[in-house]
Each structure stands twice: as C-alpha cells, then as structure tokens.
Swiss-Prot record:
Domain ACT: 70-145
Top-level taxon of origin: Bacteria
Organism of derivation: Carboxydothermus hydrogenoformans (strain ATCC BAA-161 / DSM 6008 / Z-2901)
InterPro entries: ACT-like_dom_sf, ACT_dom, UPF0735_ACT_dom-cont
Family indicated by similarity: Belongs to the UPF0735 family.
Protein name as catalogued: UPF0735 ACT domain-containing protein CHY_1913
Cysteine disulfide partners in this protein: none
Length: 146
C-alpha cells in the first residue's frame, strides 16, 4: 500500500482549478443543502475539474480536526486574559488537555495550550483567528498537531 505524502503549499501559487476545488469543498461543508452542481457553478469551476481534485485537496487545518493541536500564545500580563482564552476554547467545545504558562517578561506571558479538537464547533482556522482578535492576546500560533 502506497503511503500518501502531503505538502504545505501557499494557496496563491496553486493552479486555479485546485484553489476553486478547495472553495467548492468549503462551500459544500458550510451549506450542505447545496448540490455539487450548484456549488461548482457558484465558484466557477467545471464538475470534471472538481471531481479530479476533490479527494486530494483540503484546507490545512482540516487534517487536524479530531486531533490534538498545540498553540503558543503571547498574552498580556493582566488579570483574566488567560481565563478568557480558556473560556473561549471551552465555549466551542475544545477540550484543553495541558496548559503551560511561563513567568511574564516585559508584561507578556508565553502560554502553550494543547487542545483536543474532535468535538470543536469551529474550525481550527476560525479558532486561531478569533483568539488572535481577543483583547490581551498579542500572538497566536499553531506549533504542533498530532
């Protein structure tokens, strides 16, 4: 059995058919009432191109769903910032497995959080974006997944 290899590639260098295949898959996952025909028409790709690439194209974070991810965050040293981050993760059914917080230096605390993502109600990409927008969070980075 041949093992599939994966590459992490910036979306802007991919051919249009592959980018649009990813768009169709995202559209279908967000709007399950759509048919493939309707989705490919909305995105502007042929059905044959979609079917050619659909089994090999998926968002980067999709492969991490149902897995354990590790995030590195820089948090302002203020009361309640870490608590808000943890409550936010819990609100979307992320299961926090470990937390490691270093002593704050220069008003910033480095925090590492491992999260089980299987039951999460948002994508990992959406989680990262939302966390990065939170007051008191200056950096969020996905540093590992297993």
């Amino acid at each position: 059995m041949k093992k599939t290899k994966f590459l992490l590639v910036a979306v802007d260098i991919l051919p249009e058919a592959i980018r649009k295949t990813a768009e169709v898959k995202e559209l279908l996952s967000k709007r399950p009432e759509l048919t493939v025909n309707e989705a490919v028409e909305k995105v502007g790709i042929s059905r044959s191109a979609f079917y050619k690439y659909k089994d090999g194209v998926f968002p980067f974070y999709h492969k991490a769903s149902g897995k354990i991810i590790t995030l590195a965050l820089n948090l302002e040293h203020r009361a309640g910032v870490l608590s808000k981050v943890l409550n936010f993760i819990a609100q979307y059914q992320g299961n926090v497995l470990t937390i490691n917080q270093n002593l704050p230096l220069g008003g910033i605390a480095n925090v590492t959080i491992s999260i089980e993502t299987e039951e999460m109600k948002v994508s990992i990409e959406e989680l990262l974006e939302a966390l990065s927008q939170m007051d008191g969070v200056s950096k969020v980075e996905l540093v590992g997944q297993s």
